[in-house]
Amino acid sequence: MANKTEALYNALLPMKIAGFDDIMQAASSVIEGTANRKYIYRKYVKRLIEAHKLLAIRKGLYAILSPLEKAEKYEPDKLLIASKIRKEYYLGFHTALEFYGCAYSAFNEAYVCVNSKDRFDPFRYKRFIFKPVFIKDTTSQIVEKPYGSSLLRVSSKERTFVECIDRVQYAGGWEECVKSLENLRGLDVEKLISPTLHQGKIGLPRRIGFFLDILRKRSPFYEHVTDTMLSKMEIEIKGSPQYLVRGKKSSLNRRWNLYIPDAFEEQLRGI
């Protein structure tokens, strides 16, 4: 293998996962002069793939294998791959819960939150499925977290909480969601209240309040939730009662003006 090809491989190796833009940037410090993408692919990337030092995950996305790794035994890193699909993104919902170490179950899906202009088709790589979730705001309450030699963009704990309650289908359903959230440490409830109220969704404050009320009874990580905090949600409740789960026999929780499925809390306790 040519020396420059080997030098490019060594430059990419710490990344473990690289998009083609990463490869072009690394190549600019290895080769002399400038080169277009087709040339870099044909001259270097293709050779590294043939030498089993790069694995193509999808078009424009590659795994970099260490000298001791075998292609047939390669175990992909779901979070690292998800972080390289788009430049403007964040890992959210159940994927964020997994990052924070509180997810009740490990999912094969990775939820990559992007603006609709950055959409991509869902794809599978080995046992993992990578899915876009379309979000208008991809910058508020997003934090960069070190992950190996990389940085991941992840929704803050507070935004993760709100979004999981708001779109529970991306958090694994109510049982998985609640069991995961009860292990979410270090939640700043005041930071959670503000974005909830500013979203302007009529049903969201009552759902957030209801689940904070449940969680402070279930988890030591929510013992700091006070009635004063909950009252900020309570005074925002407007309009007719809403159903937490449609199509199920439910009873009205008058405090939160929310129809809750019968035996819902008992079922959660039995998880």
Q: Which residues does each PLM region occupy?
A:
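Exposed, interaction-prone assembly regions rather than primary DNA-binding/catalytic cores
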Residues: G92-K145
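A general structural signal for short secondary-structure junctions and capping/turn motifs
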Residues: K46, L54, G101-Y104, D121-P122, ...
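Short coil/turn segments at secondary-structure boundaries
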Residues: I23, K59-G60, E109-Y111, W174-C177
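Positively charged, aromatic-accented nucleic-acid-binding surfaces
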Residues: K78-I85, H94-L97, S155, M233-E236
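Short beta-edge/loop segments at beta->alpha junctions of small alpha/beta modules
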Residues: M1-E88, R185-K201, L212-D213
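Hydrophobic alpha-helical interaction segments
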Residues: V143-I271
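Residues in well-ordered beta-strands of folded domains
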Residues: A63, Y111-C113, K131-V133, R246, ...
